[in-house]
Amino acid sequence: MTTILKHLPVGQRIGIAFSGGLDTSAALLWMRQKGAVPYAYTANLGQPDEDDYDAIPRRAKEYGAENARLIDCRKQLVAEGIAAIQCGAFHNTTGGMTYFNTTPLGRAVTGTMLVAAMKEDGVNIWGDGSTYKGNDIERFYRYGLLTNAELKIYKPWLDTDFIDELGGRQEMSEFMTTSGFDYKMSAEKAYSTDSNMLGATHEAKDLEFLNSSVKIVNPIMGVKFWDENVRIPAEEVTVRFERGHPVALNGQTFSDDVELLLEANRIGGRHGLGMSDQIENRIIEAKSRGIYEAPGMALLHIAYERLVTGIHNEDTIEQYHAHGRQLGRLLYQGRWFDPQALMLRDALQRWVASEITGEVTLELRRGNDYSILNTVSDNLTYKPERLTMEKGESVFSPDDRIGQLTMRNLDITDTREKLFNYVESGLIFSGNAGLPQVANPSLQDKSAK
């Protein structure tokens, strides 16, 4: 039996993820007028561009919501964000700049917490504003059904009746006005923005064209670091972790993770830290482009990875990066709570994050320009005395190194023979492409005789 309802279920309760914007306002009012019983649920994700959350449920009731609830998701959102940092769960990077999966993290929290609230109210039909071309429609679908196995999905934007009547923003605005609501359509921007307290996403419209750069974006979490008229003085900041968890900024200890992240956002935002331009692969394999902000996540990530490289050995770091990228892709696909993701999270948090205790001092300048000034940890395996170039007591002697190099003769000989075989078969040409002049030592011995 299908879980997706193509037409409005008249007379039934429908929970709508209500943002208070034009789209969800018009959808809620339309559903009520057509005979459904809408319930509105708003997630408080600490969006930097939202200044009055309490007003949103009130507006929902004015538009016909049977009930409207504001669900505080900030604590859970920050917990998932810190888990992502601990695991390095980020797979989209361009030129060393990272996308911190802030929208996928927000969807994981929203999709589970709102549906759980609906279930408490006996609401088993859910609608949201995601479109059929994007990632969110699948993320919300997965998280919703994971939370409530009896859930049915109704999306006005998949209903041809709704689209025929209110297919565009102009039609929605006129509908609100003729229904007696003085709803003023916000000014059209050159792009759309979606945000939570972990980060902001700017995409679509003009940003679909690659000749439209970051310079058309007005940051909501940072500053226009590319604008020479914006003064951004350098700033030192110290970040402290205990067992993989960020606990202090500039010597100030935080007992509330939400407040710590807000302060990290303020510090990083003053410099435009964590802003990136990414071309990515959506779940449906089509490529899209986005401009992202995540100043606090970037600050914590930089300090965390500095400690990772100073504490763990090479093989552990390699596994951290490999599994982190794999986990990041699962997160992006809406599989953050799937068994394969939980397995990776557990391993990375248990064996990598648990050892990350220490303090990193950075100097932040403009954008992603920064320097690491100091790294302090009792767990560091970086010990300069082991490799010092100065005369003194050493953990190994010249004779020890001679023995170690002699043991390399075995694999050097094997490699030389393999290279000769490749030359003989025509796979490579001796002396080309930076390869050494390769000769078969056995043939050389015969010619010498």
Curated annotation (Swiss-Prot):
This enzyme's EC code(s): 6.3.4.5
Positions with a binding annotation for ATP: A17, F18, S19, G20, G21, L22, D23, T24, S25, A43, G129, T131, D136, D194
Entry binding sites for L-aspartate: T131, N135, D136
UniProt keyword annotation of Kinase present: no
MF GO annotations: argininosuccinate synthase activity; ATP binding; protein homodimerization activity
Main location: cytoplasm
Positions of L-citrulline binding: Y99, N135, R139, S192, T201, E203, E280
Cell compartment(s), UniProt: Cytoplasm
Pathway, per record: Amino-acid biosynthesis; L-arginine biosynthesis; L-arginine from L-ornithine and carbamoyl phosphate: step 2/3
One CC-aspect GO term: cytoplasm
Substrates-to-products reaction catalysed: L-citrulline + L-aspartate + ATP = 2-(N(omega)-L-arginino)succinate + AMP + diphosphate + H(+)
Single Gene Ontology BP annotation: argininosuccinate metabolic process
Top-rank taxon: Bacteria
Similarity field: Belongs to the argininosuccinate synthase family. Type 2 subfamily.
HAMAP family: Arg_succ_synth_type2
Name of this chain's protein: Argininosuccinate synthase
Taxonomic lineage of the native organism: Bacteria, Pseudomonadati, Pseudomonadota, Gammaproteobacteria, Enterobacterales
